[in-house]
Design a protein with these regions (language model features):
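Extreme N-terminal leader/targeting segments of oxidoreductases
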Residues: 1-7, 66, 74-75, 120, ...
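Glycine/Thr-rich phosphate-binding loops of Rossmann-like dinucleotide-binding domains
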Residues: 40-41, 119-120, 159-161
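Short amphipathic alpha-helical segments
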Residues: 20-21, 44-45, 121-124
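Core beta-strand elements of the Rossmann-like FAD/NAD(P) dinucleotide-binding domain
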Residues: 3-5, 98-108
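N-terminal Rossmann-like dinucleotide/flavin-binding domain of flavoprotein oxidoreductases
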Residues: 44-103
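N-terminal glycine-rich anion-binding loops that anchor highly charged ligand groups
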Residues: 32-45
Length: 161
């Protein structure tokens, strides 16, 4: 059973990288699939992150994620720049297939793919993303205090945030 890994992590945002660090420190020899296009998750598209502990004056999203990636590398987690395209999570041994057609087996799988926002197709929506158009009320609500805003989509969670 030497080709069966202890743990495979899918996703390379803060949760995926944190899982990889802890798994590596526990000597589980994790494999982390960081994606084929943009590793680092949604924070790679974020400017200043002011609510992450340890950065009193804030930190740029890409800088934070690069620092986390270096920490993952330091603990010798195996980082694969590819997407997982299919999974069979039934049974004791899980099987994952990546975009290159490689299959990896593991006893445990951590899914840390994060979330994705949905654009609604307004003119200039992409251009104004991060400059008035926001995708995270919890993250960005602070910047819009005492202003008139519109909340679109998200079901109950949009109003709760």
């Amino acid at each position: 059973m030497s080709d069966v890994n202890e743990v495979v992590i899918v996703g390379s945002g803060p949760a995926g990288y944190t899982a990889a660090i802890y798994a590596a420190r526990a000597q589980l020899k994790p494999i982390i699939y960081e994606g084929s296009v943009t590793a680092g998750g949604a924070l790679m598209n974020t400017t200043e992150v002011e609510n992450f502990p340890g950065f009193a004056t804030g930190v740029m999203g890409p800088e934070l994620m690069e620092s986390m990636r270096k920490q993952v590398e330091r603990f010798d987690a195996k980082i694969i720049t590819d997407d997982i395209v299919s999974m069979n999570l039934t049974g004791e041994i899980k099987e994952l297939t990546d975009g290159s057609g490689n299959t990896v087996k593991a006893k445990s799988v951590i899914l840390a793919m994060g979330s994705a926002y949905k654009e609604i197709g307004l003119p200039n929506e992409k251009r104004l993303s991060g400059r008035g158009v926001s995708w995270c009320a919890t993250c960005d609500g602070f910047f819009f205090r005492e202003q008139v805003i519109a909340v679109v989509g998200g079901g109950d969670s949009a109003m709760e945030e």
